[in-house]
């Protein structure tokens, strides 16, 4: 059996999966350790054998969205001063004017003076987390590794950009590395608390973490690359929705309704839309491959404030809805108005009883505008799903799958907008279902250098001699074959980098890097 747990900012949801959803449980997330332990105690009895636990969380994403990230610095290795391009986003950058060229050759090595000056700079600014990023490092990470080793020996937490992505988009790699560094300690603390809570009850069960692309990885891998799991919570919700949508061919929107934020996902032919080239979070354009999500600052616990004569919907949570004993009326109370006397009492108490119609129209207009923005975003470029690519496809959804705790309360508003609304069974724990059923994201990295006549896939200790005629077609086949030997799931190539090594005017070899992984999906 499998347990899925989603740790959100408001609630922790958990499910026990066997032949379907056997048990489910929801508890407040105020104390992370206690909420995880309580969830496990409610789901497990002595006769159950737990095969794995998969976890998703929005806690790190919430920290980034609210600006609650740690001080982090970037050690930039390139041949031109670029720090001024990032100074409004990254306060602490040290540029070392060493560099590797586009062929991966070291043109100017790192000097001891650069390293010692950078060390002094970061210490004086009380920086503990450092991201090291070298231009063209995917073609040769030697300078990143040299700097990374130096800073580690001096007590810093270090993230090297080339370990996060093999793509050559230098600006996005800088931002990805910075983001990973700035959540390094926060993420480790969250993961450590989760792991210790689980281990207090289940000593040997495999623990997996949901990635932003909807796959799951062992907790030991996730902790090395925290940036890959930043949108873990929304990804789990989308994978949980896939459980309900696998037989649908229409365009669909999924809305995961939360306390003060709701996440919007997109489906075409029962397949979620994906950001293949990398997501943007706040001002951070990254190389993190993720399921496409659009956040709407509205949830079941959102309250109403007035600025003069203007109604303002607040996304600052002030407690549970009034009808459930909270301090103020919320979107949930509005949805229940006319059915729940407690909700009506709350609107009277706040002097809003004569403004019900205005508030409802504002909510409906607010949701409509965000859905239009979300659909426009999907249609603004070529559409990729986890199964296929659409070049001139127009996404035009008529149906909405509502999940999350506030789903029943949002239906009233979406009905008014003309959508066909579906609320599935176990809607309130859809995210935990997605975490439980998401496929393991087995990944293999192939490196080949025809000049040195060597090929390696480190994850499986595979090494092979190759000849000068070896190319990317053969490399892809090896990756596919090796992945298929360890999994029955569909596999895909997610990164490919090939460049010719030139001496004089002659091509003397090829350097090839191929990354393959299991396609995101469900294990059933």
PLM ranges: what are they?
Residues 1-524:
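N-terminally biased helix-coil "hinge/interface" segments that flank
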């Amino acid at each position: 059996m499998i347990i899925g747990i989603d740790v959100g900012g408001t609630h922790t949801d958990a499910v026990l999966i066997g032949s379907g959803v056997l048990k489910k449980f929801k508890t407040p997330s105020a104390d992370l350790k206690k909420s995880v332990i309580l969830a496990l105690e409610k789901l497990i009895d002595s006769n159950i054998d737990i095969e794995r636990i998969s976890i998703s969380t929005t806690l790190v994403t919430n920290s980034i969205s609210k600006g609650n990230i740690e001080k982090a610095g970037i050690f930039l290795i390139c041949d031109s001063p670029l720090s001024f391009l990032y100074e409004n986003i990254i306060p602490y950058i040290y540029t070392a004017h060493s560099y590797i060229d586009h062929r991966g050759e070291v043109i100017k090595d790192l000097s001891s003076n650069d390293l010692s000056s950078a060390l002094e700079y970061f210490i004086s600014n009380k920086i503990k987390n450092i991201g090291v990023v070298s231009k063209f490092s995917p073609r040769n990470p030697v300078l990143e590794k040299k700097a990374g080793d130096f800073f580690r020996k001096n007590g810093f937490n270090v993230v090297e950009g080339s370990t996060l992505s093999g793509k050559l988009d230098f600006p996005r790699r800088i931002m990805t590395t910075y983001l990973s560094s700035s959540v390094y300690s926060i993420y480790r603390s969250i993961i450590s608390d989760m792991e210790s809570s689980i281990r207090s009850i289940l000593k040997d069960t495999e623990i997996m973490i949901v990635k932003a692309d909807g796959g799951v990885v062992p907790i030991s891998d996730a902790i090395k690359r925290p940036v890959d799991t930043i949108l873990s919570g929304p990804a789990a919700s989308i994978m949980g929705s896939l459980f309900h949508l696998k037989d649908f061919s229409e365009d669909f929107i999924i809305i995961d309704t939360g306390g003060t934020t709701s996440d919007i996902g997109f489906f075409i032919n029962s397949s979620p839309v994906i950001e293949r080239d990398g997501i943007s979070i706040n001002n951070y354009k990254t190389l993190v491959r993720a399921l496409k999500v659009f956040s709407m600052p509205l949830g079941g616990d959102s309250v109403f404030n007035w600025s003069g004569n203007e109604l303002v919907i607040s996304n600052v949570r002030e407690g549970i809805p009034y009808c459930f004993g909270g301090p103020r009326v919320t979107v949930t109370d509005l949805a229940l108005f006319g059915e729940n006397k407690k909700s009506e009492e709350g609107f009277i108490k706040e002097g809003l009883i004569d403004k019900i119609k205005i508030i409802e129209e504002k909510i409906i207009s607010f949701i409509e505008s965000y859905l239009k923005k979300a659909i426009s975003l999907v249609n603004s470029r070529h559409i990729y799903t986890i199964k296929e690519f659409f070049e001139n496809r127009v996404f035009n959804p008529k149906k909405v799958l509502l999940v999350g705790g506030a789903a029943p309360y949002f239906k009233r508003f979406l009905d008014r907008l003309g959508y066909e609304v579906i609320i599935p069974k176990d809607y309130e724990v859809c995210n935990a279902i997605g975490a439980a059923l998401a496929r393991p994201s087995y990944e293999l990295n192939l490196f080949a250098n025809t000049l040195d006549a060597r090929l390696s896939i480190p994850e499986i200790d595979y090494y092979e001699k190759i000849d000068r005629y070896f190319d990317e077609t053969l490399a892809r086949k090896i990756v596919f074959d090796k992945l298929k030997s360890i999994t029955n799931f569909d596999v895909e190539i997610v990164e490919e980098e090939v460049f010719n090594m030139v001496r004089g005017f002659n091509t003397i070899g090829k350097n090839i890097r191929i990354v393959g992984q299991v396609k995101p999906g469900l294990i059933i």
